[in-house]
Amino acid sequence: MIRTLALLGVVTGAAMTDASIVHAAQWQPPSGIEQIALWPDAAAIARPEVRGEERAVEQASLVAGQPWTAVEDVVRPTLSVFPAKGANTGVAIVVFPGGGYNVLAIDLEGTEVCDGFTPLGITCAVLKYRVPGSGEHWDKRCNCRRKPREPMALQDAQRAISLLRSRAGEWGIDPHKVGVLGFSAGGHLSAAVSNGPTRRYVPVDGADAQRVRPDFSLVLYPGHLWDGRHLEQVTNLAPVSAATPPTFILQAQDDPVDDVHESIVYYLALLKAQVPVELHLYAHGGHAFGMRATAQPITHWPALVETWLHAIGMLPPAR
């Protein structure tokens, strides 16, 4: 936990320093991709403590030799839907970018992920959830951990799942094959929405008649799950139970931001609750590598996910 707090800037700090800014503008999805408002205009949702207008800031720091983009100060969350390519399997994945609940690594851990999964016949949706301070986070102003008064990120995640299911016919989705995939803070969000059957907001329209829990969950290099001392209990999460969906966890042992015990403690809780779970740990790989392939074996994780989705019956049997 101490290491997580001290090195959180590996992902979030770059977005907060002028030296890292190449250009800034409001983020838009790739051409041809539909971006929809997550909430009706009349919905009374909490507003994060923003520093200004929403902006997408290209970072000078490189991942696999390429820059990445951080979205800051999101007040109006959206869902960008990438249609399945080829034979539609009916599977849908909602992607939660990481960024310490302060910014969103929108391409590295968002749009690029959808580009990788849609060729498998999977509909993919990137959630641009509210930040900053929408989940438990490290606040530089007080040099302390803070929890939001309203679980804004969790509310956005639940709403995104309900919204996808409500429009399943339109997007060719099987409402019983809707999963989540999150990185870092987004990994915590994947775990949180997987263990919270109760809606954390007042329903706003007919879409909220749908279930809020996903049918499967992918948790990559998560944070905020371990108290730094005990492996017997998960922190910042509703109780893990047999109702938690099948889960895939992946992390590197040399992760400098979130200790590998973040994954281990969650794995042990799932194991105890008899939830089908796969845990993949690698000696090397670091943090925030997204879906960008390098010489590190861990970056070839998408092939493991594809095999796992076949194994749990989400994707049809492999030929």
Indicate where each model-derived feature is located.
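Conserved alpha/beta-hydrolase "acid-adjacent" motif
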Residues: 256-262
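Cap/lid segment of the alpha/beta-hydrolase catalytic domain
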Residues: 100-109, 126-152, 194-198, 226-229, ...
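C-terminal catalytic histidine-bearing segment of alpha/beta-hydrolase fold enzymes
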Residues: 264-319
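Primarily recognizes the serine-hydrolase "nucleophile elbow" in alpha/beta-hydrolase
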Residues: 152-242
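N-terminal cap/lid segment of alpha/beta-hydrolase-fold proteins
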Residues: 25-87
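Short beta-strand element of the alpha/beta-hydrolase
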Residues: 90-98
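Short amphipathic alpha-helix adjacent to the substrate-entry channel of hydrolases
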Residues: 107-125
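Short beta-strand/loop motif that positions the catalytic acidic residue
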Residues: 249-251, 255
